[in-house]
Swiss-Prot record:
Residues 25-206 are extracellular. This is Sortase A. Changing N132A: Does not affect dimerization of the full-length protein. Disrupts dimerization. Its main location: membrane. GO terms for molecular function: cysteine-type peptidase activity; metal ion binding. It comes from Staphylococcus aureus (strain NCTC 8325 / PS 47). It catalyses: The enzyme catalyzes a cell wall sorting reaction in which a surface protein with a sorting signal containing a LPXTG motif is cleaved between the Thr and Gly residue. The resulting threonine carboxyl end of the protein is covalently attached to a pentaglycine cross-bridge of peptidoglycan. The active site is at H120, C184. CDD domains: Sortase_A (cd06165). Pfam families: Sortase. Transpeptidase that anchors surface proteins to the cell wall. Recognizes and modifies its substrate by proteolytic cleavage of a C-terminal sorting signal. Following cleavage, a covalent intermediate is formed via a thioester bond between the sortase and its substrate, which is then transferred and covalently attached to the cell wall. This sortase recognizes a Leu-Pro-x-Thr-Gly (LPXTG) motif, which is cleaved by the sortase between the threonine and glycine residues. Utilizes lipid II as the peptidoglycan substrate for the sorting reaction. It is found in: Cell membrane. InterPro entries: Sortase, Sortase_A, Sortase_dom-sf.
Amino acid sequence: MKKWTNRLMTIAGVVLILVAAYLFAKPHIDNYLHDKDKDEKIEQYDKNVKEQASKDKKQQAKPQIPKDKSKVAGYIEIPDADIKEPVYPGPATPEQLNRGVSFAEENESLDDQNISIAGHTFIDRPNYQFTNLKAAKKGSMVYFKVGNETRKYKMTSIRDVKPTDVGVLDEQKGKDKQLTLITCDDYNEKTGVWEKRKIFVATEVK
């Protein structure tokens, strides 16, 4: 009996060690898989754009947001925050955000004065979507690649708003074009709720 008890304790100990190792490694594995997936999608996007341009050298098609929600519409790069993410069509539903960073609204246009893009923030995954956006500051550069265009922006405003404050999505007539980047902020460990939204506004550099 004692022999079996010792064996069971040994097995239980091994299982606990394996579970602990898995829990420790999981965020790193998830980050690796996410980075690999997004890099492949960005590479494929650039390849598709280049192929399309070579087919139609005389007339460069104006970049458009795909109607297919699973297609990449472009990608955003923020060097100061070590962010480079493919951007998907809106709206930023849970399903779309599972694919990746996406336009906040369904009717978003690349010609809008205020282009809004939303992305997740995860506590234990620093490389995931907009988690590290907090490393950006006023003056940080933002690059938005759509088709053959690389649009340049500079961070001009960073602030918190309530989740219900949808005014950040509004067009602002008479003002320079801008990107509005949206992610979660102020995580409440007791309720498991992100109580605020962090808003990063980047104004186009002409």
